[in-house]
A protein has these predicted regions:
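Mid-to-C-terminal "cap/lid" subdomains and adjacent gly/pro-rich loops that border
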Residues: 1-59, 114-119, 136-139, 144-147, ...
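A general boundary/transition motif marking the beginning of the first structured unit of a protein
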Residues: 16, 100, 132-133
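Compositionally biased, intrinsically disordered low-complexity regions
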Residues: 30, 64, 128, 132-134, ...
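C-terminal structured subdomain/cap of oxidoreductase catalytic cores
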Residues: 33, 63-121, 140-213
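Mobile, glycine/GP-rich and aromatic-enriched active-site lid/loop segments adjacent to catalytic centers
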Residues: 44, 108, 125
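Residue-level detector of flexible, active-site-proximal loop/helix-junction positions
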Residues: 50, 128, 165
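Active-site-proximal substrate-binding core of FAD-dependent oxidoreductases
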Residues: 123-136, 213
């Protein structure tokens, strides 16, 4: 805790130190394999060693390239837990339910390895810590991914906009069958966007304000 206070003071006084960086210094999009129609994976580059979203203090220095599918095909659900609207709902994320998500994730790891294996990165290279150079077969990849993969905080599409039987809101973001109720967040997206959800969600909110005002 003392170290965190010192880091905060350093940033407040000098605008320097660990708090002066976003910790995500670079990113990008790529195809996980040549037959993909469009870039289907997203990268986040950390010039640091991050474990469990930063909740675990690392015991070494390093850098990481996180890779994930842009459009996972697995589908979860959000359902009512009780009739009390103040109780928490049942949330089933259902990660990796679709086999193609696992295939894309394996391909993403291989692309990340190729990027970090370039000559320009060799002066900074060290031992691969995850998944580890010994992880090479589909079975080992799957074991690693199922045990170590983490969410990237992009839940969406649970109250989709549309005009089919699964749609919850219309083109004005109004909930079907209920008056004076709109939903304005990432849940109304029919499909997840290609990349982070913050900017598209702000756009949805801006549009909703126009509908309301």
């Amino acid at each position: 805790k003392f170290n965190m206070l010192k880091i905060g003071i350093q940033w407040f006084l000098n605008k320097s130190g660990p708090c002066s960086t976003s910790f995500l210094e670079a990113g990008g999009f790529a195809k996980s394999s040549p037959e993909r129609e469009y870039p289907n994976i997203q990268f986040h580059f950390f010039p640091s060693f991050v474990i469990d979203h930063g909740l675990v203090e690392p015991d070494r220095h390093g850098y990481q390239l996180h890779a994930s599918p842009n459009h996972p095909k697995s589908r979860g659900s959000v359902t009512l837990n009780t009739s009390n609207p103040y109780n928490y709902p049942n949330i089933l994320f259902n990660y990796l339910e679709n086999k193609d998500d696992l295939k894309q994730t394996i391909e993403a790891i291989e692309v990340a390895r190729d990027i970090l294996g370039q000559n320009s990165m060799k002066p900074f290279a060290g031992k691969e810590t995850g998944p580890g150079s010994d992880i090479q077969t589909p079975e080992l990849y799957e074991d690693y991914i199922r045990s170590k993969a983490e969410t990237a905080y992009h839940p969406s599409c649970t109250l989709k906009m549309g005009n089919d039987d699964m749609a919850v809101v219309d083109e004005k973001l109004k909930v079907y069958g209920i008056e004076n109720l709109r939903v304005v967040d990432a849940s109304v997206m029919p499909e997840i966007t290609s990349g982070n959800l913050n900017a598209p969600t702000l756009m949805i909110a801006e549009r909703a304000s126009e509908f309301i005002l």
